[in-house]
Amino acid sequence: MSEEFLKQLFETEVPEVFEGLVEIKKIVRVPGYKSKLAVISNDPNIDPVGTCVGVGGVRIKPILKELGTEKIDIIAWNSSQEDFVKDSLKPADINRVEISDDEKSAKVWLDEDQRSLAIGKMGQNISLASRLTGLNVELVAIETKEDLDQKLSNEF
């Protein structure tokens, strides 16, 4: 099942995608595990993510059923690379993103307890986020005050 197949499923289940009111900018997949879609609407009155999910998930549920165990993350396309990288790494909570001068990589700061969420099962979440954004994503874990206090107390 390709990215094109997933796009056709969305065109079937989401009239706004079929009509072009919501555009799927990019799809990246690991079939059977997870897909990430970046969506945008040129109409400020249309929430592209909410439109694709539907009230109570009514639009996304038939797509998920068709895909079996595969999960789908729908992300709003964002012209701010920093925000787009942040959103693409969900469900992880990101503190800060810095895009390299050559715009080929992103350094992402997050709390240590968010690291495994950002990486995902077998590295799939960070891999899909990198493919979706077109950037090499590097995670930088920030130790919390409690972590530092614990290290200090263990040293004495």
Regions found by a protein language model. Name each.
Residues M1-F156:
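RNA-contacting regions in translation and RNA-metabolism proteins
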